[in-house]
């Protein structure tokens, strides 16, 4: 069994030096993006992520946020994006319902989310739009390559709450 989503979308280009992402201040090749996702995936697994575990994310868009999505899929997790405009009561509902093992949020929102994460037993990490935070600090401690965790075609890749 393979990880069909990661293998179909990201793996075919993993070693390419061609530019994958263009940002205002840098260009990122497929290979550099893969190395970044490998470090994040290894970090998630080291923190206890198992196949099917949820990773809830309420953070501003950035390259690292996109890499977190790819890394979650690669590590066999289920990505749970949460709108940055949700109130603490809404977050309490969504996090209580989904029961993620990890929660990623901005430093500014961490104070409100910390008691919720503690109540559900989730690891709390921070990630700001400038890519600073405990997630980036923890990820640099890990090296790749990271082999994608096998997932079946019926396994979840993401959970999207709607209004």
Stretches found by the model and what they are:
Residues 26, 42-86:
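Conserved AMP-binding/adenylate-forming
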Residues 59, 82-83, 105-106, 121-131:
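Short beta-strand elements of ligand-binding domains
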Residues 7-29:
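AMP-dependent adenylate-forming
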Residues 18, 31-56, 86-88, 92, ...:
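ANL superfamily AMP-binding
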Residues 17, 142-161:
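Conserved pre-ATP/AMP-binding loop-to-beta segment of ANL
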Residues 78, 101, 123:
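Residue-level detector of anion-binding/catalytic polar loops
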Residues 86-116, 135-141:
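Conserved ATP-dependent adenylate/AMP-binding module captured primarily in the ANL superfamily
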Residues 9-12, 33, 37, 44, ...:
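Adenylate-forming
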């Amino acid at each position: 069994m393979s990880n069909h989503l990661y293998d179909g979308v990201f793996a075919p280009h993993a070693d390419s030096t061609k530019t994958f992402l263009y940002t205002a201040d840098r260009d990122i090749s497929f290979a550099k993006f893969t190395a970044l996702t490998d470090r994040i995936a290894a970090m998630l697994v080291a923190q206890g992520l198992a196949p099917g575990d949820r990773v809830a994310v309420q953070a501003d868009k950035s390259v690292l946020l996109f890499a977190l999505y790819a890394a979650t899929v690669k590590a066999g997790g289920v990505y749970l994006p949460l709108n940055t405009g949700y109130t603490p009561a809404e977050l309490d509902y969504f996090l209580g319902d989904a029961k993620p093992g990890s929660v990623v949020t901005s430093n500014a929102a961490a104070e409100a989310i910390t008691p919720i994460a503690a109540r559900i037993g989730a690891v709390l990490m921070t990630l700001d739009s400038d890519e600073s935070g405990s997630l980036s600090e923890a990820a640099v401690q890990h090296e790749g390559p990271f082999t994608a965790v096998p997932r079946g075609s019926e396994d979840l890749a993401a959970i999207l709450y709607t209004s």
